[in-house]
From Swiss-Prot:
One of its GO terms (cellular component) is cytoplasm. This is ATP-dependent Clp protease proteolytic subunit. One of its GO terms (biological process) is protein quality control for misfolded or incompletely synthesized proteins. The lineage of its organism: Bacteria, Bacillati, Bacillota, Clostridia, Eubacteriales. Belongs to the peptidase S14 family. The keyword tRNA processing does not apply. It is found in: Cytoplasm. It comes from Clostridium botulinum (strain Loch Maree / Type A3).
């Protein structure tokens, strides 16, 4: 069971209490601080769409501290980030690994950040399947297509040649915040809020 802090705000009508994430949402901040799965993807997509409806011209800030997770769930978030009108700024706090790293690089170019002691990890898709040989073949073909798609997007968003991205994602590839900047996964390492 996770504990969610509550903040109390004074208004002219008295006190109002919010869970911390609702309060951050008022400031157009979304937190991805767990595994990427269907539930977290639905929550983040809903928050992105809500904030776009509130003000389509104001940036949204997605803070990421995630070990990664489901490719299809992550692609739902990625596609929504690209679909909506506001720029989505991404900020790595802690670790952005696997699909977490993919979502970090998916932020608006020029607005992708990491705190100084953050880490980023990229790698190829993971998967497992059991069943009949024909079905295993179908799933193996699907994961290879996903690998190609993810690497192509990473190449486009980092400016690295596809061949380099394919080589670097063959195994777990850990990068410090500065290395992530050099690689093109982020645009700037920040230590103070602007």
């Amino acid at each position: 069971m996770s504990l969610v802090p509550v903040v109390v705000e004074q208004t002219n009508r008295g006190e109002r209490s919010y869970d911390i994430y609702s309060r951050l949402l008022k400031d157009r901040i979304i937190m991805l601080s767990e595994e990427v799965n269907d539930t977290t993807a639905s929550l983040i997509v809903a928050q992105l769409l809500f904030l776009e409806a509130e003000d389509p011209d104001k940036d949204i800030h997605l803070y990421i501290n995630s070990p990664g997770g489901s490719i299809t769930s992550g692609m739902a978030i990625y596609d929504t980030m690209q679909y909506i009108k506001p720029d989505v700024s991404t900020i790595c706090v802690g670790m952005a690994a696997s699909m977490g790293a993919f979502l970090l690089v998916a932020g608006a170019k020029g607005k992708r950040y990491a705190l100084p002691n953050s880490e980023v990890m990229i790698h190829q898709p993971l998967g497992g399947f059991q069943g009949q040989a024909t079905d295993i073949g179908i799933h193996a073909e699907r994961i290879l297509k996903m690998k190609k798609k993810l690497n192509t997007i990473l190449s486009d968003r980092t400016g690295k040649p596809l061949e380099q991205v394919e080589l670097d994602t063959e195994r777990d590839h850990f990068l410090s915040a500065e290395e992530a900047k050099e690689y093109g996964l982020i645009d700037e390492v920040i230590d103070k809020k602007k």
